[in-house]
Amino acid sequence: MPGPPFEGFPLSFSSSEASTSLQASPSHALAPYGWDAGWEAEFAPHAEQGLLPGRVVRVDRGQCDLVTADGLIRADTAFVTPHDPLKVVCTGDWAAVEPVGGNPRYVRTLLPRRTAFARSTSSKRSEGQILAANVDHAIITVSLAVELDLGRIERFLALAWESGAQPLVVLSKADLVPDPTGLSYLVEDVETTAPGVQVLPVSSATGEGVDLLSAVVSGGTSVLLGASGAGKSTLANTLLGEDVMTVQAARDVDGKGRHTTTTRNLLLLPGGGVLIDTPGLRGVGLWDAETGVGQVFSEIEGLAADCRFHDCVHESEPGCAVTAAVEDGALPVRRLESYRKLLRENQRIVAKTDARVRAEILKDWKRKGAAGRAAMEAKRGRIR
């Protein structure tokens, strides 16, 4: 069942705003939600057909809520339901909607996405799932109530970089680490894991870091990502300045909570910008994220450029600059193991969906198998 319109959106704009927007340009009313000259130009052909622009703020089965120049409306998505799960209507999408008069009103098309968050699902059908669209900042929320899982942070970072958004790691519940020295060590650990990414300790209880975070999200669209119990809903309420999202306690033993947020909602921030809150992600499977993985492990990619062989896999090859860095202590072995793990996982996902890649992997396996057999025969003196 579709939910009712939620708090955080006006049911209608002022008559002067709506009138100006509908007669001239919708940008006046929708600018707070991210509408700009680029979207205006992209939408122009649809405006000529009498359609109206709107941004998807929540998706239900077969329907979605959109904010438009008329305010918040509900529309049917039957015309934009493709077989590809990565192309379905998603929170953050910009859409062309039928004008007032239709009952129900229909979404006729989606504008091309600038950025898109996708992960692999846990199903056996090797499908991707779209989490949010047209996002500028990815706020990866990590709770300090439990031990840091650096590998999980790397997964979220790979997903964020691959989407095209700028990641930011927020260490929530910073008040639970009262020792400044201990907190700085934790920040340094995450900074080492997240090169080129700002790491910000934040406490909704004390207000630490809230002003800095508010400044980051005040422009553009931000999405909150994190595991269940990471404190995303509490953080969302802090940024929104009111208790819009329900908050539930996390288990003390592992910091995991029940899903407070069950749908992806787009909400207007009081200081400017919009926020998409997502349900806690128990599974963070990669989806065609080779570029994102490379960005997360940029120091390894840099070292790889100095390897003797261009196809070095950084295991036992002679002249490998990456393994040499591990032996010298310049590169933590955990980083290399995590890098290998994510690359293998991503390759498996790509192979399941790309016949050409499957053929290349099979060919590589056969080549390595033949080389291994030749080496064994040479060792046993069977080659004449």
Give the positions of each predicted feature.
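Short aromatic-glycine-enriched beta-strand elements
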Residues: 62-66
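Beta-strand/loop nucleic-acid-binding surfaces
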Residues: 72-88
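Helix-rich effector regions associated with P-loop NTPase G domains
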Residues: 2-33, 46-50, 84-101, 111-131, ...
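Structural detector for short beta-strands of small beta-barrel domains
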Residues: 50-60
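A conserved segment at the C-terminal end of the G1
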Residues: 232-248
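Phosphate-binding glycine-rich loops and their immediate beta-loop-alpha structural context
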Residues: 129-134, 140-193
